C-alpha cells in the first residue's frame, strides 16, 4: 500500500536510547478541540406545543445527525386549539371549534393560513394577531392562493383522514366522534381527531439554528373573524449514551501501571508457526473476544489504566502480525513510538453498507473529534476531494442522493476532514464540502530486527548500521478488507485470524475512547476555568 503521506512529510522513526520505550508510552492522536463531527448521531426529539395551553400536540424522536434529523410531523388542528375556539369565547354558532363532533366536521373543509412569529416583522403584529395582522405575512397553509415562502422554516398542509361524518343509511359515524365518549359510533377516533395536519421542514429550516423554540400563528380563512391558534416547534438533542465520569480526576485518565494479572492470563491463544518458541518481551493480555459487528463496551464503569491500554496495543499488534506473518515474529522488537503521530491511517478499498437508518456501528462506536495526521496509500474516497488529497483516492464516489448512512466495513473508519468517524451521513456530505477516505487505523508500532536493541548494550566502539524501522501498518495494511476476507496464505482459518485482529481492534477502541473522555473533560475544565478568570 504505497502512496504519498498527507499532510505531513515522513519523519525518521529511529529514536535515541533515552526516548526508546517498549511499552510505557502514552498513545495519543492529534486532537481537534473544535465542535463534534457533523456526522455525530444523536437522539433528536421534535415537539409541537400549543402555546395557549402548554400541551404537546406532537413529540417525534429519531436517530440522526443535526443535518438530516428532520422528520415529517403529524398532528391534529384541535391539538393546537384546545378550548380557545369554543362558542362562549367567539360567537354562538361559529361553524368551527373542537368541542363538538359537528364543529370538528365543519372545520375540516375550512381553509387556513400560517404566519411565522420568529421573523419579528412589525407589520405582522404579535401573538394577539396570530402574527398575521396584514395580508402578505402568511408563508404556508391551505387556501386558494396557496401561500408560500422562500425563507420560512416549515410548511403546514392538510392531511387525509379516512371516514365521513354521515354514513350510508342516514346514520351518524366517522372519526370526528370521540370513541371515549361515543364508543358505539362506527369509525370514532381517539379524541375525535379528524382535522389532521402535516408539518414538514423546508431547506431553510434544515439549515437554521434550533437552539430555542420558534413560534407560528394559524388562522382559519372564513367570513368575519379569522380565529387564531398559536403553536411552537422546538428541538431537543441528546447523546445516545451520556458520557460518564471515570475516576476522581475528570481531566486526566487513570494513569495506572499494568496490572500483573493482565500480563499473565489470556483468553486468546496466539498462533505460532511450527518451531516458534515465542517472542521476547511479548506477553498476552486478558481480553474477551466479541464479533466485529458487535460494539465494544467496557464491562464496568472503571476504565483500565494507561499502562494496560498500552500493553494491550502492543500485544494486539503482535497477535495480528503473528497470525498473518509468523516468520516475522520469531525474533523481533515491537515498539510504541514516543512522539507523534501515534496512530496512522492506511487508505483501503472496501464495500461499505448503505442504509436508510443509522446502523448499530453509528450509534455505539465513538464519534471521534479526532484528526489523523498521517494517511497513506490509496483507497476509496467519498465526496468532493480537493486536489491536495486526491492522491489518496484510487476510487472516488460523489455519494448518494437523499438521507443515507454509509457504514464503514468492520475494522475500518472514515477519515473525514471533520474528524474520524465509523459512519457517514450523506445529508451532511451533500450539503457541505466534507469529504472522507476509507482507512484502516493502526497504532504507531514500529517493527525492528533483534539487533536493534542489542546494539544499545554493545559498548564496543564500531560503526553501526542505521537500523531499518518499519511500521506495522505498512506490514499489515489491507488486512481488514483483503487479508481476513480472502485469507492471507498462512494456512490458518479466517476465524482464527479474525479473533487475533479483534483483540487489536478492542485495544485501539479502548484507548481512543479513553482519550475522547479525557478531551471532553478537559474541554469542560477549560470552560470552567475561563468563567472563573472572567
Swiss-Prot record:
Motif (CXXC): 332-335
Glycosylation sites: 43, 58, 286, 322, 327, 351, 354, 430
Cysteines engaged in disulfide bonds, as pairs: 115-132, 124-137
Organism superkingdom: Viruses
Compositional bias annotation for Polar residues: 258-274
Keyword Glycoprotein among UniProt keywords: yes
Record region (Disordered): 245-279
Signal peptide: 1-34
Example of a GO cellular component annotation carried by this entry: viral envelope
Glycoprotein found in the keyword field: yes
Site-annotated residues for Cleavage: 465-466
Listed Pfam families: TLV_coat
Coiled-coil parts of chain: 496-534
InterPro entries referenced in this protein's UniProt entry, alphabetically: FMuLV_rcpt-bd, TLV/ENV_coat_polyprotein
Positions in the Extracellular compartment: 35-534
GO BP terms, alphabetized: fusion of virus membrane with host plasma membrane; symbiont entry into host cell; virion attachment to host cell
Modifications the protein undergoes after translation, according to the UniProt entry: Specific enzymatic cleavages in vivo yield mature proteins. Envelope glycoproteins are synthesized as an inactive precursor that is N-glycosylated and processed likely by host cell furin or by a furin-like protease in the Golgi to yield the mature SU and TM proteins. The cleavage site between SU and TM requires the minimal sequence [KR]-X-[KR]-R.
Function in brief: The surface protein (SU) attaches the virus to the host cell by binding to its receptor. This interaction triggers the refolding of the transmembrane protein (TM) and is thought to activate its fusogenic potential by unmasking its fusion peptide. Fusion occurs at the host cell plasma membrane.
Assembly notes: The mature envelope protein (Env) consists of a trimer of SU-TM heterodimers attached by noncovalent interactions or by a labile interchain disulfide bond.
Protein name: Envelope glycoprotein
Organism: Feline sarcoma virus (strain Snyder-Theilen)
Lineage: Viruses, Riboviria, Pararnavirae, Artverviricota, Revtraviricetes
Amino acid at each position: 500500500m504505497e502512496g504519498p503521506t498527507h499532510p505531513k512529510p515522513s519523519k525518521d522513526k529511529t529514536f535515541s536510547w533515552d526516548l526508546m520505550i517498549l511499552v510505557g508510552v502514552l498513545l495519543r492522536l492529534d486532537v481537534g478541540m473544535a465542535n463534534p463531527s457533523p456526522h455525530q448521531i444523536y437522539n433528536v426529539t421534535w415537539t409541537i406545543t400549543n402555546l395557549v395551553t402548554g400541551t404537546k400536540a406532537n413529540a417525534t424522536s429519531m436517530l440522526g445527525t443535526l443535518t438530516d434529523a428532520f422528520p415529517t410531523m403529524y398532528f391534529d388542528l384541535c391539538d393546537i386549539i384546545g378550548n380557545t375556539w369554543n362558542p362562549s369565547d367567539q360567537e354562538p354558532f361559529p361553524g368551527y371549534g373542537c368541542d363538538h363532533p359537528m364543529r370538528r366536521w365543519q372545520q375540516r373543509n375550512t381553509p387556513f393560513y400560517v404566519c411565522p412569529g420568529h421573523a419579528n416583522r412589525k407589520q405582522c403584529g404579535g401573538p394577539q394577531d396570530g402574527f398575521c395582522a396584514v395580508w402578505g405575512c402568511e408563508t404556508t397553509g391551505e387556501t386558494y392562493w396557496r401561500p408560500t415562502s422562500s425563507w420560512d422554516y416549515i410548511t403546514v398542509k392538510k392531511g387525509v383522514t379516512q371516514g365521513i361524518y354521515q354514513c350510508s343509511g342516514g346514520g351518524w359515524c366517522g372519526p370526528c366522534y370521540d370513541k371515549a365518549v361515543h364508543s358505539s359510533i362506527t369509525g370514532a377516533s381517539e379524541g375525535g381527531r379528524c382535522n389532521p395536519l402535516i408539518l414538514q421542514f423546508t431547506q431553510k429550516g434544515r439549515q437554521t439554528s434550533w437552539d430555542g423554540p420558534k413560534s407560528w400563528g394559524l388562522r382559519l380563512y372564513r367570513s368575519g373573524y379569522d380565529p387564531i391558534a398559536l403553536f411552537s416547534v422546538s428541538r431537543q438533542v441528546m447523546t445516545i449514551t451520556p458520557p460518564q465520569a471515570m475516576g476522581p480526576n475528570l481531566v486526566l485518565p487513570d494513569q495506572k501501571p499494568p496490572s500483573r494479572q493482565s500480563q499473565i492470563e489470556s483468553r486468546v491463544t496466539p498462533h505460532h508457526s511450527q518451531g516458534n518458541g515465542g517472542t521476547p518481551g511479548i506477553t498476552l493480555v486478558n481480553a474477551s473476544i466479541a464479533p466485529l459487528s458487535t460494539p465494544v463496551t467496557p464491562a464496568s464503569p472503571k476504565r483500565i489504566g494507561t499502562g494496560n491500554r498500552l500493553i494491550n496495543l502492543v500485544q494486539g499488534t503482535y497477535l495480528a502480525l503473528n497470525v498473518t506473518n509468523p516468520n516475522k515474529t520469531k525474533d523481533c522488537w515491537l515498539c510504541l513510538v514516543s512522539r507523534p503521530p501515534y496512530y496512522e491511517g492506511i487508505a483501503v478499498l472496501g464495500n461499505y453498507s448503505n442504509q436508510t437508518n443509522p446502523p448499530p456501528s453509528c450509534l455505539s462506536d465513538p464519534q471521534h473529534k479526532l484528526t489523523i495526521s498521517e494517511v497513506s496509500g490509496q483507497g476509496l474516497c467519498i465526496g468532493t476531494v480537493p486536489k491536495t488529497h486526491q492522491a489518496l483516492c484510487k476510487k472516488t464516489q460523489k455519494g448518494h442522493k437523499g438521507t443515507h448512512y454509509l457504514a464503514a466495513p468492520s475494522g475500518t473508519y472514515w477519515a473525514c476532514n471533520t474528524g474520524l468517524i465509523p459512519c457517514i451521513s450523506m445529508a451532511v456530505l451533500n450539503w457541505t464540502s466534507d469529504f472522507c477516505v476509507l482507512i484502516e487505523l493502526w497504532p504507531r508500532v514500529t517493527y525492528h530486527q533483534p539487533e536493534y536493541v542489542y546494539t544499545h548494550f554493545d559498548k564496543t566502539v564500531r560503526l553501526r548500521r542505521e537500523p531499518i524501522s518499519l511500521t506495522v501498518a505498512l506490514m499489515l495494511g489491507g488486512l481488514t478488507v483483503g487479508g481476513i476476507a480472502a485469507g492471507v496464505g498462512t494456512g490458518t482459518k479466517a476465524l482464527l485470524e479474525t479473533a487475533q485482529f479483534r483483540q487489536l481492534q478492542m485495544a485501539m477502541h479502548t484507548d481512543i475512547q479513553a482519550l475522547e473522555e479525557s478531551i471532553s473533560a478537559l474541554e469542560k475544565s477549560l470552560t470552567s476555568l475561563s468563567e472563573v478568570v472572567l
